[in-house]
C-alpha cells in the first residue's frame, strides 16, 4: 500500500462555470474524490459563473482575491483547478495566491504514478508527467520551486520528478526508448495469444465501475479492489474456464 509520511495537504477546489448548470458541481465532486485518492484533504470549493475564462488568471480578478482570502482563512496548503491550466495561468495564480497551484491533470497523473505497478505502466506514467511538466517550465521557476514536494510532484515509486529542462529532455528520450522496447515485447505476446485461437475478452468501463471486482469474481485473480478512483491502473490478464 502506498505510504505518505508527509503532512496531509489541505486544498481548495475551484472552477469556472460557463453554462451556469449542474455539471461543474458534479465535476468538483469527482475532483474531490481524486484529491482524496492522491492523499490530500479538501477544505472547500469555489465556483465562478462566467461567460469566458480569463486567459491570464483563469478566474476573474475579484474571484482571485476571494480565493486568496479563502486560502488564508482556511489554512489551505494549495488549490486545485478542475480544468487544465495553461503555464501562464498557473504562474500568475501562484504569484497572486502565494500558494501551491495544481490542476486536475496533475492530480490524475499523480494518482497514476501512485498506482502503476508494471514496468511499462511506470514508464508510461513518468513519461506523461515529464511531458506535461516540460511544457510548463518556461517562466515557471517559482511555481516549480513551490511544487517541491507533495501531490502533483511525485513520479512512480515516490521518486521526485525532475525540474531541470535539459535533464527532463534526456529522461524523456530514455523513457521513450525503453517504452518502445516494452511495447514491442507486448506485441509479440499479443500475437502469441491470437495464434493460440483462445477467445480473448476484455472488461472495460469507467474508473471505479467494478472491473477489478468482476475480474476477481470470475477468475479469482486477486487484483486490488478499492472504492477509489483509479485504484488499479495496469492491465491484467487471467485465464477463465
Task: List each model region and its residues.
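Residue-level signature of catalytic and energy-coupling elements of molecular machines
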Residues: 31, 79, 130, 168, ...
Amino acid at each position: 500500500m502506498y505510504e505518505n509520511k508527509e503532512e496531509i495537504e489541505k486544498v481548495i477546489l475551484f472552477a469556472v462555470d460557463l453554462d451556469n448548470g449542474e455539471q461543474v458541481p458534479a465535476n468538483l465532486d469527482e475532483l474531490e474524490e481524486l484529491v482524496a485518492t492522491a492523499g490530500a484533504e479538501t477544505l472547500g470549493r469555489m465556483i465562478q459563473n462566467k461567460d469566458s475564462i480569463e486567459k491570464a488568471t483563469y478566474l476573474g480578478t475579484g474571484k482571485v482575491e476571494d480565493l486568496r482570502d479563502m486560502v488564508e482563512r482556511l489554512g489551505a496548503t494549495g488549490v486545485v483547478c478542475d480544468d487544465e491550466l495553461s503555464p501562464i495561468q498557473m504562474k500568475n495564480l501562484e504569484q497572486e495566491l502565494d500558494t501551491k497551484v495544481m490542476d486536475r491533470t496533475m492530480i490524475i497523473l499523480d494518482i497514476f504514478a501512485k498506482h502503476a505497478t508494471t514496468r511499462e505502466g511506470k514508464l508510461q506514467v513518468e513519461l506523461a508527467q515529464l511531458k506535461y511538466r516540460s511544457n510548463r517550465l518556461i517562466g515557471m521557476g517559482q511555481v516549480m520551486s513551490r511544487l517541491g514536494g507533495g501531490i502533483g510532484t511525485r513520479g512512480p515509486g515516490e521518486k521526485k520528478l525532475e525540474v531541470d529542462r535539459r535533464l527532463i529532455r534526456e529522461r524523456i528520450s530514455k523513457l521513450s526508448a525503453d517504452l518502445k522496447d516494452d511495447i514491442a515485447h507486448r506485441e509479440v505476446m499479443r500475437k502469441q495469444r491470437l495464434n493460440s485461437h483462445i477467445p480473448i475478452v476484455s472488461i472495460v468501463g469507467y474508473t471505479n465501475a467494478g472491473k477489478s471486482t468482476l475480474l476477481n469474481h470470475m477468475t479469482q485473480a486477486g487484483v486490488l479492489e478499492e472504492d477509489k478512483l483509479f485504484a488499479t491502473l495496469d492491465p491484467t490478464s487471467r485465464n477463465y474456464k
